[in-house]
Design a protein with these regions (language model features):
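Juxtamembrane and boundary regions of transmembrane helices in multi-pass small-molecule transporters
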Residues: 169-172, 177-231, 242, 404, ...
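Membrane-embedded alpha-helical segments and adjacent helix-loop junctions characteristic
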Residues: 57-147, 306-399
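Short, amphipathic, aromatic/basic-enriched membrane-interface segments that mark the entry/exit
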Residues: 3-10, 102-109, 127-131, 230-239, ...
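Hydrophobic transmembrane alpha-helices of multi-pass small-molecule transporters
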Residues: 1-80, 197-207, 211-335, 480-487
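Alpha-helical transmembrane segments in multi-pass membrane proteins
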Residues: 19, 41, 45, 49, ...
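Hydrophobic transmembrane alpha-helices that form the pore/transport pathway of multi-pass ion
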Residues: 107-197, 201, 374-418, 483-485
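Early transmembrane hairpin of solute transport permeases
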Residues: 52, 76-163, 177, 197-200, ...
Length: 487
């Protein structure tokens, strides 16, 4: 340890500067940056960070161990992502997603659609505690409905993500909703109640914006006729209401606190079983085998791991009826691993901590302290590329500062959620941004400007802090009582 030196600010920033330059070049030169360009950029930036680490006296073994550790921490997300790919495949061939689109077109008014998409996504996400499951299931169906009535897919994706991350932030079943108060040192329900002060006005503004967009949207240019969509779906699938048993079972097991991996596996297999029962024509279209048992096995496997594209008389509808299974998620898995390598190297040499030191010194007033926390969460979401790191590290960094200023821990936990949780999906190379972009098939840069809830949240929490609205402080003589969290 004695031979190791602390990095200068320039040394700590150098890998990030290299990363920003490479990512900018990729956007200019490559159409599909997720196809490999951004992954290589992250690895090259990690190589630069490794050179800095060696210059500071760190050995390769310590850097390697940190890389392995950070990749290991991302494995649950990677496994969930792969299962979501399989679930999307079996839910397509079973007719679950087409049925959602079919019946949704009858129930949802075009002008109220975006408003409804936010509300529905929020309700499902609060009930399940998972933005990922919400977006991969009801979100995919809502995107199909939105495209069918002629709304730009980026706007629809923004509405879905806004609602889903409301639930991710507010649901007592959500992992981030439990993680933030644990890092800050408060209890879960105090944390949730305190979040309502900033979350409710943020959600209200989000709904108003989407309501205005919906009523100002020009539907005369819609490229898909709703009746044509319904007719094409009806001609390809058996759209029985019984198909809704699949999502009902999935959401039920999630609400019962069955872990995400077995929950998604149950949903995937159930989708395959319903495909065999309800969609024999689809099964035979995919496999071409004479024996139905063989055809069923082939179709289920193909939907779970590979490309499936079903054709209808309407070419526009065909865009809604395709999936890539697990294989479609591999570029995103590659991106997540690359991001974890970069984050691991940066953390191993203390480069991330060095960059945030000036931010901590800047935090004098309550407003500046909250703004510094927000900025740090954004920084870690961008550089470490992981939502959990963006909550855990700032939570540990700033916890003592909040105590010293007499601020109750729920202010810190709320700030971690208002910035760390919701902004992760706005970063293309963050695990959340990369995943939701791949699941919805919409580029992160395209939907980010319309994810109003995620954009407004950090500004709302800073506004409350600077205006001293609902800022909880310890009374004179009151001692902090916080939950100790092991490192």
């Amino acid at each position: 340890m004695s031979g190791k030196r602390n990095a200068t600010l320039f040394m700590a920033l150098l890998p990030i500067i290299v990363l920003i330059i490479l990512l900018t070049l990729n956007v200019i030169l490559f159409e599909d940056t997720l196809g490999g360009a951004n992954q290589i950029a992250l690895m090259m930036a990690a190589a630069v960070a490794s050179l800095v680490a060696f210059r500071l006296g760190y050995e390769w073994e310590s850097v390697r161990k940190k890389i392995v550790s950070t990749i290991g921490s991302a494995m649950p997300s990677i496994l969930i992502l792969l299962l979501i790919g399989s679930l999307a495949g079996t839910w397509l061939i079973s007719g679950v997603v087409p049925a959602m689109i079919y019946y949704g077109l009858d129930l949802i008014s075009p002008r109220m659609f975006l408003f409804t998409a936010v509300v529905v996504s929020a309700i499902v996400s609060v009930a399940t505690g998972s933005s990922w499951s919400t977006i991969a299931t009801i979100g995919v169906a809502l995107l199909g409905i939105g495209k069918a009535i002629g709304i730009d897919e980026a706007v629809v994706a923004g509405a879905i993500i806004s609602g889903a991350y409301f639930g991710d932030k507010m649901s007592p079943l959500s992992d981030t909703t439990n993680l933030a108060p644990a890092m800050a040192g408060t209890d879960l329900f105090t944390h949730i109640r305190y979040m309502t002060y900033t979350t409710v006005p943020t959600m209200a503004l989000t709904l108003i914006v989407f309501l205005v967009i919906g009523f100002r949207y020009d539907f005369s240019g819609a490229t898909i006729d709703v009746e044509n969509v319904k007719s094409a779906i009806e001609g390809t699938f058996n759209t029985s209401p019984l198909l809704f048993l699949v999502p009902v079972v999935l959401f039920t097991v999630i609400i019962m606190k069955v872990p995400p991996l077995p929950s998604l596996f149950i949903g995937t297999i159930l989708g395959g079983v319903f495909a065999i029962i309800f969609q024999p024509d689809v099964i035979r279209t995919i496999s071409h085998h004479e024996n139905y048992a063989t055809a069923s096995y082939y179709s289920m496997m193909q939907a779970m791991f590979g490309d499936v594209s079903l054709t209808t008389p309407d070419e526009n509808v065909n865009e809604l009826l395709s999936t890539s299974g697990m294989s479609g998620m591999l570029d995103t898995v590659w991106l997540i691993i690359s991001a974890m390598i970069f984050g691991g190297v940066m953390e191993s040499a203390g480069l991330l901590k060095r960059i945030t030191q000036p931010i901590v010194k800047y935090a004098k007033s309550t407003g500046n302290l909250v703004a510094s926390t927000v900025g740090t969460c954004l920084f870690f979401n961008t550089t470490a590329s992981d939502q959990y790191i963006a909550i855990v590290v700032p939570g540990r960094m700033f916890r003592k500062n909040y105590e010293e200023k007499g601020l109750k821990p729920e202010l810190l936990s709320r700030t971690l959620e208002d910035s760390g949780t919701v902004t992760s999906v706005l970063i293309p190379w963050n695990t959340c941004g990369a995943t939701q972009s791949r699941v919805l098939g919409v580029d992160t840069w395209s939907y980010a400007p319309y994810a109003f809830f995620n954009i407004i949240s950090p500004f709302m929490t800073m506004l409350f802090a600077y205006l001293n609205i609902k800022i909880r402080r310890y009374a004179s003589g009151e001692q902090p009582v916080v939950v100790e969290v092991e490192d």
